């Protein structure tokens, strides 16, 4: 399974890096030709919304998880995990961040190596909080901007689809935006306006993907701390040092 995952990740990275710029350029050219430069204004609202949601989850949700589920002070975690988040931001790849994440969780957060060795690789492909958040907001942005009616039921379905899709998202740069298309197709958001909105997301989503990766790898580290605490395999002296 691990070898297959690596092959898929390498293949997606190659395809995205090689062909995505040309595809995005063609889509944007058509977008600006039809709607003009004003079509970028709604996209800015999408960017701001995603950034606020990601930072809120990072600085509010994770500390709450650590305090309530692991019964530890979240300040040492946030301080020590900062370099993991920064590395994830710069590489935009959970797979590339895995060695540093494992080293940090074991040596600085006091997580037993057995826990880190199991939780972190699993979380790299399953625990995709940031990806799910981005895909939900992006799908709603596409729906609203392309004239589809968004109801509470449709939002719930989008959230479920995003959760399922994020679990299988490969740990490769830009993969989240590619998987987003499956959600849009599943919801039936496939008219011309929806495709144009999706092209805007592809064009501006690189910094968003970097923040998403930071959130994902931080979530993996937080989960390993919680699991280690539950299994009584967390060295709290190292954690609080």
Cite the ranges covered by each PLM segment.
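Buried hydrophobic positions in well-ordered alpha/beta secondary-structure cores of metabolic enzymes
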Residues: 8-9, 94, 119, 171, ...
């Amino acid at each position: 399974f691990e070898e297959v995952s690596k092959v898929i990740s390498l293949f997606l990275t190659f395809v995205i890096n090689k062909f995505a710029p040309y595809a995005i350029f063609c889509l944007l050219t058509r977008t600006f030709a039809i709607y003009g430069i004003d079509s970028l204004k709604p996209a800015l609202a999408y960017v701001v919304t995603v950034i606020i949601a990601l930072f809120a989850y990072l600085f509010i949700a994770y500390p709450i998880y650590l305090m309530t589920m692991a019964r530890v002070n979240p300040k040492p975690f946030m301080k020590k995990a900062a370099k993991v988040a920064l590395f994830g931001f710069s590489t935009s790849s959970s797979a590339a961040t895995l060695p540093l994440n494992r080293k940090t969780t074991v040596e600085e957060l006091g997580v037993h190596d057995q826990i880190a060795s199991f939780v972190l690789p699993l979380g790299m492909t399953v625990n995709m909080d940031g990806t799910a958040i981005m895909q939900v907001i992006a799908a709603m942005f596409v729906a609203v901007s392309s004239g589809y009616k968004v109801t509470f039921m449709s939002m719930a379905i989008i959230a479920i689809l995003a959760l399922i899709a994020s679990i299988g998202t490969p740990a490769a740069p830009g993969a989240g935006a590619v998987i987003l298309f499956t959600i849009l197709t599943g919801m039936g958001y496939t008219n011309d306006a929806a495709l144009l909105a999706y092209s805007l997301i592809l064009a501006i989503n690189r910094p968003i993907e970097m923040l998403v990766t930071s959130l994902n790898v931080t979530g993996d580290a937080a989960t390993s701390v919680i699991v280690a605490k539950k299994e009584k395999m967390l060295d709290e002296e190292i954690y609080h040092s």
